[in-house]
């Protein structure tokens, strides 16, 4: 990626700078000290992977000599605005109050009752620390896929969105780089793609989005959304892999048209080896059964799915070029996203629109 293209991205999508902020790890010794000081806890500490936050698994001996007790400590990245971190915190508190049956992490208050602790790390940078429950389960990518699992994912997302609809927060409308409403702003990345076939494929999907979705998004039901309901953020029960046992990572939350959240999730459910449209229509129908959608929302789902896939291949490719040491992690969805985009582009949007309306009875 050339410097010129990078400058164009930051000009059109300035909030993307947080995605390229250098890693800001914190020493385990400091984390242990914070746990003792603020939560009165001690135990074995293991650093976990994370896109921006520094994450640590705390394992403590059980008082009753049973299974060890585990908690997750999240330390925010200094480049993340405090308001954004608080939005995520308030979402978890909101869900605990209004939808306690949903399998999301619970916040563990510090000794003074605070669920978020502000502190300066050894490097002098401000951080926010939050201690959460540790969700057990098998990461969905490691589990067998099935139609029942897809239906479970869609139904759970519908219930999550229904619960989040009443959440209000001043950071909900802040600009985020992963906002499908702004998919057209990655065009500079798409136009710079070296492969002419892939470039044309992505350009076509952006054109479809700009002509058939973008002008109509503003009239659709809008609310806080998870905005990253992909299989890497979901856990399943190993004994019943069709059942979702955990929802992770509220770090990309934003207020957006409700259908955007479904589009993000559906983009990761496209079956490239079978019926691509069928998997998306079944997914939409399962969501609709829990949280009814209107015809105007369904009419935009197909171009929105493709727009999300374009964003995945464009943004992750750009980030990998700027952060080659992190490329394997960043590009883990790249190849399959290209395949999904190609499968979707092969189906006329009018056919997809009719199939979605039929599947949902609209």
Positions of predicted regions on the chain:
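Juxta-kinase regulatory segment immediately upstream of eukaryotic protein kinase catalytic domains
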Residues: 2-41
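Active-site acidic catalytic loop and adjacent metal/ATP-binding pocket
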Residues: 51-68, 72-73, 107, 210-260, ...
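Conserved short submotifs of the Hanks-type protein kinase catalytic core
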Residues: 125-138
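An alpha-helical support segment within catalytic cores of ATP-dependent transferases
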Residues: 24-37, 168-169, 184-227, 237-239, ...
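Active-site activation/catalytic loop segments of kinase-like enzymes and analogous catalytic loops
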Residues: 258-292, 306-324
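A cross-family kinase active-site recognition segment
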Residues: 111, 140-200, 220-222, 328-331
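ATP/Mg2+ or Mg2+-diphosphate-binding catalytic cores
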Residues: 19, 192, 312-362
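A conserved alpha-helical element in kinase catalytic cores
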Residues: 75-126, 143, 147-151
